[in-house]
Amino acid sequence: IILPRFLDGLAKVPPRKRIRIRREAAALLKGEMRDGAVDLALDYFALQEPGYHSECVMTETLLSLSRRDHPTVAERLSLETFLSLRHVVLAPRTSTMPMIDLALSKRGLQRHISVTVPHFLSMPMMVQTSDMICTLPRRMAHLYADHFHLKSHTVPLRIPRFPVYVIWH
């Protein structure tokens, strides 16, 4: 979501510069940022340590995706249906519990995680050909819903908006 706009700005940078995208949390990249091996990190958590700068570049919410002809998902996704479905999820980068699972656990509930994948892009591809659903940041969910012909649904839980930070040293 951010990357295409970011790359447009890099058109003005000398051609020998290279972009490498990694999936590590910013906290795990501190040494590389300090040493100049990593210039920027994107994360849902600010890095609040001396010498590091974190700027919120947007806030997000979550949406769930299902295939358009899903046999049990109506226009509105109920909590009961949400909990009864199998979920494909992104492999966690840290030991922090995902917001959606934290919100469920506070209510004594748990979703059925069937498949864990290493990349966001794998999620809609699996949803498109199965009865599983996935939950993603809203902007990404809208892009994937259009591209993969999926239906988007409001997550049937109260989940606060969350920040996305760009972090540098």
Language model segments and positions:
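Flexible hinge/capping segments at coil-to-helix
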Residues: 49-87
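A late-sequence structural motif
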Residues: 1-2, 6, 68-74, 79, ...
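Alpha-to-beta junction loops
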Residues: 33-42, 62, 109, 127-134, ...
